[in-house]
Amino acid sequence: MAPGRRVERVAALIRRETSELLIHGIRDERVHQGMVSITNVEVSGDLQHCKIFVSIYGEEIQRSEVLEGLEAASGFLRGELGRRLQMRRAPEVHFHLDRGIEKGTSVLNLLEQLEQQRETLGEVQSESDQPTTYETTTVNKT
C-alpha cells in the first residue's frame, strides 16, 4: 500500500473513532456544552501527529470551553485510538477550530440580503417604469 493511501486511511479511521469517542467515551462536561462536528482530520506522513478540525455550534465562550475540554481529553483519545486502531504508537492529537461552516453561513446570509435588496429595488424600478398617463385634449379648430 502506498504511504499516501495509508495516511488517508488512518485519517479516516481516526475521524470515525474520534466521532464515536466524542459521543460515548469522553465524560468531560465541557465537551458536551456545544454541538461538536469533526470536519477534517490531517495526519502527518510519519503518523506521529494528527490535527483534528472541529466545528462547534454555540457561543464563543462555549466554543473555547469545548476546545479546552477536547485538548484536556487528547491524552485519553490518543490512548483509545492506539488501542482501537491497534497501532504501535498512536499519533499525538491536536484539536483546531474550523470556522469554515461559520464563514459559509455568513456568505449565505450576505447573498440572501443582496437578493432581498434586489427584489426591493426591482419593485421600486417597476413602479417607476409604469407609463405615466397624461390626459390629452384635442382642440378643434373651426
From Swiss-Prot:
Disulfide bridges in this chain: none
Which UniProt keywords are given for this protein, alphabetically ordered? Cytoplasm, Ribosome biogenesis
Q: Where is this region: Disordered?
A: 120-142
Q: Where is the composition biased (Polar residues)?
A: 123-142
**Annotated Gene3D superfamilies:** 3.30.300.20
**Gene Ontology cellular component annotations, sorted alphabetically:** cytosol
Q: What does the UniProt entry say about where the protein is found?
A: Cytoplasm
Signal sequence residues: none
An example Gene Ontology molecular-function term: ribosomal small subunit binding
Q: Which GO terms describe its biological process?
A: maturation of SSU-rRNA
Q: What's the chief localization of this chain?
A: cytoplasm
Pfam hit, one: RBFA
Name the InterPro entries on file: KH_dom-like_a/b, RbfA, RbfA_dom_sf, Ribosome-bd_factorA_CS
The entry sums up its family as follows: Belongs to the RbfA family.
* Assembly with partners or alone: Monomer. Binds 30S ribosomal subunits, but not 50S ribosomal subunits or 70S ribosomes.
The cross-references to HAMAP family, in alphabetical order and at most eight, read: RbfA
Q: What does this protein do?
A: One of several proteins that assist in the late maturation steps of the functional core of the 30S ribosomal subunit. Associates with free 30S ribosomal subunits (but not with 30S subunits that are part of 70S ribosomes or polysomes). Required for efficient processing of 16S rRNA. May interact with the 5'-terminal helix region of 16S rRNA.
Please identify the protein, giving its name as recorded: Ribosome-binding factor A
Origin species: Prochlorococcus marinus (strain MIT 9313)
